[in-house]
A protein has these predicted regions:
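A short glycine-rich, Lys/Arg-flanked "PGG" loop and its adjoining helix->strand segment in the class I
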Residues: 197-212
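Substrate-binding/catalytic lobe of Class I Rossmann-like enzymes that use SAM or dcSAM, i.e.
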Residues: 227-229, 233-322, 326, 337
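Conserved class I S-adenosyl-L-methionine
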Residues: 116-123
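Conserved alpha-helix/loop element of class I SAM-dependent methyltransferases that forms part
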Residues: 97-115
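A short acidic, Gly/Pro-enriched loop at the edge of an enzyme's catalytic core
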Residues: 171-184
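N-terminal auxiliary segments of SAM/dcSAM-dependent transferases
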Residues: 2-76
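Class I SAM-dependent methyltransferase SAM/SAH-binding core
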Residues: 120, 129-172
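A short SAM/SAH-binding and catalytic strip from SAM-dependent methyltransferases
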Residues: 183-194
Length: 338
């Protein structure tokens, strides 16, 4: 088995899915932005230094989040981010897809898995990352995801064990025994955590002693000032574009590890800005094509509207990373003590 990135067939399937979106699904999707991203929780560097407690994302298990992801996954599959994450720049000469592959090799190395070990992907999407990690390590993959449509896609993948993938919610008790896994990882779903103590505690519980927990997700950086209107606007635009929930200073992530009992092995942020520029340019082209096709009545206007809504204010995303207000790739590695 050799890992393959998103194919033309995948993209055509996503386009067909978008063209089949009902009016009810369309209106539900468009309404999720106000429901999910208005007054989302933030904890900045200043909050951390003042001892302000972490405020979780209360809508992390909501029906609105499921509705959002049913459509967002289709839109992302048109580009390079079917796996639902923007990778850090590992090799600037390579594509977004190739940098995802390089990044996943780093994750596989961090997980320290052997053949036959069990590894859990939290927020596994359609299982594409799990498939690659299994290929790299020889481990047996498991995954949970809130969106049933993506789990259905994982079930159709002949390279994944169907019974190991399920609709699940990391804001609730994980339906696995204590010490069930040799490693756990989460690639950009963790801003939907409602209660960090609970979720990190559940990860700790299902890990074997010595097991690794690797997380890569959005974090606020030192430069972000919530009282600066310009910066606050950039972050809000980026939140809506990349659909992250809570926005927390990276030290809060580190504390979530250590308070759960993990030994923090490493914690580092990486830039994705060059990857972001490429993907934004691609979706700008998609937006222009969709607008034209809708104008001449080849595709429904609602298909064009969904693309425009997702790609709205995309330049803010680039600017926010360039100003070092945030990273989409704060990478933490923790180990459960032996």
């Amino acid at each position: 088995m050799q890992h393959k990135p998103t194919t033309v067939r995948d993209r055509l399937g996503a386009l067909v899915g978008l063209l089949r979106v009902s009016d009810a699904e369309f209106h539900a999707f468009m309404g999720t932005y106000d429901e999910l991203f208005t007054e989302s929780p933030e904890n900045t560097k200043a909050d951390y230094e003042d001892g302000v407690p972490l405020r979780g994302y209360i809508q992390g298990s909501s029906a609105e989040l499921e509705q959002l992801y049913r459509i967002i996954h289709l839109l992302c599959t048109l580009g390079s981010v079917e796996k639902m994450y923007m990778p850090p720049v590992i090799d600037p000469e390579q594509s977004v897809l190739q940098n995802q592959i390089l990044f996943e090799r780093m994750v596989a190395n961090d997980l320290k898995l052997g053949k036959g070990d069990k590894v859990l992907d939290l927020g596994c999407g359609c299982g594409a990352i799990a498939e690659h990690i299994a290929e790299l390590t020889g481990a047996t993959p498991y995954g949970i995801n809130l969106d049933e449509s993506q789990i259905d896609k994982a079930w159709r993948n002949p390279n994944l064990p169907r019974s190991n993938f399920a609709v699940g919610d990391f804001n609730k008790a994980l339906e696995f025994d204590d010490g069930a896994f040799d490693a756990v990882y989460a690639i950009q779903p963790m801003t939907y955590v409602t209660d960090h103590k609970f979720t990190f505690g559940e990860v700790y519980r299902v890990l074997k002693p010595g097991g690794m927990f690797v997380m890569n997700d959005v974090a606020a950086l030192d430069s972000y000032d919530r009282d600066n209107e310009h910066q606050r606007t950039l972050i809000q635009h980026t939140r809506e574009l990349t659909v992250f929930g809570g926005f927390w200073y990276f030290k809060y992530w580190e504390d979530a590890y250590t308070k759960a009992g993990f030994d923090l092995v490493s914690s580092v942020g990486r830039s994705a800005v060059e990857m972001i520029k490429r993907e934004v340019a691609l979706f700008d082209r998609y937006e222009a094509v969709f607008k034209f096709l809708a104008k001449i009545h080849v595709i429904p206007k609602k298909t064009d509207a969904m693309m425009q809504r997702m790609n709205e204010n995309s330049q803010s995303y680039i600017q926010a990373e360039e100003e070092e207000l945030l990273t989409l790739n704060w990478h933490c590695v923790g180990q459960k003590p032996e």
